[in-house]
Amino acid sequence: MNIRPLHDRVIVKRLEVESKSAGGIVLTGSAAEKSTRGEILAVGNGRLLENGTVKPLDVKVGDVVIFNEGYGVKKEKIDGEEVLILSEADLMAVVG
């Protein structure tokens, strides 16, 4: 995958989760909830501060994160694979 996010943006591959109902039935498609966990595939250089310096991101390639899939999240297909482009501010936690 040849993509480089700009500024404080990251490229995330959503992690698959197996969704089961309370009765143990595996849910698929629209009945299953989408995961809000993903693996960081690429990171931008950082956020430009008012004093002109660049603050590096707190995450790195390979980190598993929990993200907020809100207004600023962009879905794209790169090399046939769906990825999410989002700002570091949309990341809520690093797992592990």
Curated annotation (Swiss-Prot):
Name of the molecule in the record: Co-chaperonin GroES
SMART domains linked: Cpn10
Keyword annotations: Chaperone, Cytoplasm
Matching SUPFAM superfamilies: GroES-like (SSF50129)
HAMAP family: CH10
Species of origin: Shewanella denitrificans (strain OS217 / ATCC BAA-1090 / DSM 15013)
Gene name of this polypeptide: groES
Family: Belongs to the GroES chaperonin family.
Keyword S-adenosyl-L-methionine: no
